[in-house]
Amino acid sequence: MSRSDTDGRDTSFASRNGVGGSQLSEPPSQRRERPDYGYAVEETHRPHTAQERFPDSHGQRSAPDLYSRDSDRFSYHRGDTLTPAQERSYQRELELMKARGEQERSYGGASASRSSRPLEADHHYGGMPLTRGLVDDFAPEPMASSGRPNLEGFSRVENGRRYRLVVVQHPSRARMCGFGDKDRRPLSPTLIVKLIITEEATGEEISPCEVNTSLFLLATDLCHPDDLMLAPRNILVHHHASSLSSNPIQHGGAGGYATDEFGHRSGSSLGNFAADGGGPCDDGYRSSTHPQHASESTGAAALPLSSSSMNPYDRSPHASSSIQFGGGGNFAQQSQAESYTRNLVGAAVASASVLKDEQDKWCTFFVFQDISVRTEGVYRIKLMFVNLEVSGRVGTGVADALAETYTDAFTVYSPRRFPGMLDPTPLSRKLASQGIKIPVRNDKKKQRRRNDEGGDGMGDYDGASGGDEDDE
């Protein structure tokens, strides 16, 4: 802005407040020399800011200034003629003040006391005030209690029939079987589950003889005894780390390929792949390559190597390693391998058996007489029932769970702390007499064997699949 424009504004300001001469043609330099020249008594002697000299428009003002009631930024005199821009700014200010008053009357002055954290009344979405959960950082709603698994499980209806699982015999103890391939330590007592099918309309129980149970399956899984939302306890992770330092073998070939001790390129040292090269082979019973037969040429990048699992039983090995080169030509091979082992071993999935119970009533039973736990601890067993003969889904490989339940918590002991197997229950004896292989002792045979000179009374079980009397 030029000096002449500034002098003109000062002239207008002085004449408006009644100070100085009334002749507008008086030069500003002569007017400043008069003793009565100056500010009014009620005015504060301070320099004019840019905003006071040139009132900014609505879009250039900050948000708090829009709601300032005592601001003198838009104080106009009634006798003055307003420019079109000033008139529009004045109208906007009036509209904002009216809207502010309406908001305070509607919400009880909640926005008068503003804090660093906004209130619910200040947040709107589609004309409706937001809830506290959405205002607070728009956090997701917590999972409903109905979505969490509970010990009661669930029961579903399929084709007008409701399927429900009832654990008629809970295991209470077991001896850990360790990581051997053939060692089995059955649960005591044997886990027995009954399936009940009822008509949804009438609630009448359907006889197992009227139902095709050939495709009924019941799957088991280990879980935490208290918190069912924790990670399943059926997977054991083993970490194996090794470090090997040796001298590399120099070859004249191109870098980037793994070569064996005879100088030939070997693609198998990069991993165990199928014959077509499409992906890694997932055969858990076949060992992979030998890292000591692979080496890297000078200047090659670090390539992954695979290692075999220590025990192929029920394991899916995943290994990775890298080769690090040193300044002196030596390199150190450091590998980190992980192998996964099932903690629940044996026949973890059982098919249905239509048998008579203690009252000679036909029922659908699932018997788990050949499952063991590798490590000691406290567990629950999760039971999920599926019917593979669902109409319209046969052969798809996918089946929905129709029922679910959990056993009571049981303890798996170490060999030194195991208190021994419990006596067979009447239900176990009843099912064993119908051909189910449940380890049930026959006291008469055991006594007759002990009286025999050549016998030691070991391993006398009806239904015959093995128990362990050494534990008692």
Swiss-Prot record:
Low complexity bias spans: 106-116
Keywords from the named record: Cytoplasm, Nucleus, Sporulation, Transcription, Transcription regulation, Virulence
Basic and acidic residues biased stretches: 1-10, 29-59, 67-80, 89-105
Compartments in which it is found: Nucleus; Cytoplasm
Domain of life: Eukaryota
Gene3D superfamilies assigned: Velvet domain (2.60.40.3960)
Pfam families per record: Velvet
Velvet domain residues: 158-441
GO cellular component: cytoplasm; nucleus
Annotated InterPro entries: Velvet, Velvet_dom, Velvet_dom_sf
Presence of keyword Cytoplasm: yes
Recorded family membership: Belongs to the velvet family. VelB subfamily.
Biological function: Component of the velvet transcription factor complex that controls sexual/asexual developmental ratio in response to light, promoting sexual development in the darkness while stimulating asexual sporulation under illumination. The velvet complex acts as a global regulator for secondary metabolite gene expression. Component of the velB-VosA heterodimeric complex that plays a dual role in activating genes associated with spore maturation and repressing certain development-associated genes.
Quaternary structure (record): Component of the heterotrimeric velvet complex composed of laeA, veA and velB; VeA acting as a bridging protein between laeA and velB. Forms a heterodimeric complex with vosA; the formation of the velB-vosA complex is light-dependent.
Name listed for the protein in its UniProt record: Velvet complex subunit umv2
Organism of derivation: Mycosarcoma maydis (Corn smut fungus)
Underlying gene: umv2
